[in-house]
Amino acid sequence: MAPLRPTRPCPECGKPSTREAYPFCSPRCKNIDLNRWLSGSYVIAGKPLGEEDENDS
């Protein structure tokens, strides 16, 4: 049986990803990534909270 999608490297360690932890290779790498999001290491750029557009008035 052919795999549903091509194997990609784990974004944390570079090992081949597994179906159970996709796109990661293991629950450990999955948890490392989650911790980085929760601790603020990863952020999505945007306007600071409370800043209003000048065109909204």
UniProtKB/Swiss-Prot annotation:
InterPro entries linked = DNA_gyrase_inhibitor_YacG, Znf_NHR/GATA
Query: What is the role of this chain?
Result: Inhibits all the catalytic activities of DNA gyrase by preventing its interaction with DNA. Acts by binding directly to the C-terminal domain of GyrB, which probably disrupts DNA binding by the gyrase.
An individual GO BP term: regulation of DNA-templated transcription
- Give me the residues that bind Zn(2+), please: 10, 13, 25, 29
Free-text cofactor note: Binds 1 zinc ion.
- Description of how the protein assembles with itself and partners: Interacts with GyrB.
MF annotations from Gene Ontology: DNA topoisomerase type II (double strand cut, ATP-hydrolyzing) inhibitor activity; zinc ion binding
Keyword Phosphoprotein appears in the UniProt entry: no
In terms of superkingdom, the source organism counts as Bacteria
Enumerate the UniProt keywords alphabetically.
Metal-binding, Zinc
Family in the record:
Belongs to the DNA gyrase inhibitor YacG family.
Protein's recorded name: DNA gyrase inhibitor YacG
Q: Give cofactor(s), names only.
A: Zn(2+)
Please give one Pfam family short name. YacG
